[in-house]
Amino acid sequence: MAQMYFYYSAMNAGKSTTLLQSSFNYRERGMRPVIFTAAIDDRFGTGKVSSRIGLEEDAELYNKSDDLWSKLSMMHADTHIDCVLIDECQFLTKEQVYQLTEVVDKLHIPVLCYGLRSDFRGELFDGSRYLLSWADKLVELKTICHCGRKANMVIRQDEAGHAIADGDQVEIGGNDRYVSVCRKHYKEALGR
């Protein structure tokens, strides 16, 4: 039975690496996975999922206005899809998460979503909020803070490396702008 999975974590826990390994596993068995990534995330170029360890694979792009149900049902009608892999799923809209549940429930295709749970303010992204509510399986991928504890928060830094508490929820950046830390060091960095 197909299910929807949400693999979530702070930054630098290996979400994209895990997605690419899943894609490889499907292809190794002669199956066809389809990978999507957010068009807004162009850190490593467009139309690619890339991991920090050097793996990468081409991906379909999605943006907030895309109807993923229509897109995937047409793709599936053209050539059978065995699995849908979504990178940067925190950028999905509520409606897109619902559309992905339709892919699972009506087309019987597993959907594996990988993304951040919360932003630099400690607030849920919309995509993450609805995946936490509607996914069949929730899987936390772990990374570590500089102190050795589990990192479950993300700090956004300015150019001088100081923690920022305000700003737009979405600002694309990598290790130069964001650091994963434990809750204790998150609060300390923000002076709370």
From Swiss-Prot:
Zn(2+) binds at residues 145, 147, 182, 185. It is found in: Cytoplasm. One of its GO terms (biological process) is thymidine metabolic process. Its EC number is 2.7.1.21. ATP binds at residues 9-16, 87-90. It catalyses: thymidine + ATP = dTMP + ADP + H(+). InterPro entries: P-loop_NTPase, Thymidine_kinase, Thymidine_kinase_CS. It is an enzyme of class 2 (transferase). One of its GO terms (molecular function) is thymidine kinase activity. GO terms for cellular component: cytosol. The active site is at 88 (proton acceptor). The keyword DNA-binding does not apply. Keywords: ATP-binding, Cytoplasm, DNA synthesis, Kinase, Metal-binding, Nucleotide-binding, Transferase, Zinc. Belongs to the thymidine kinase family. Homotetramer. This is Thymidine kinase.
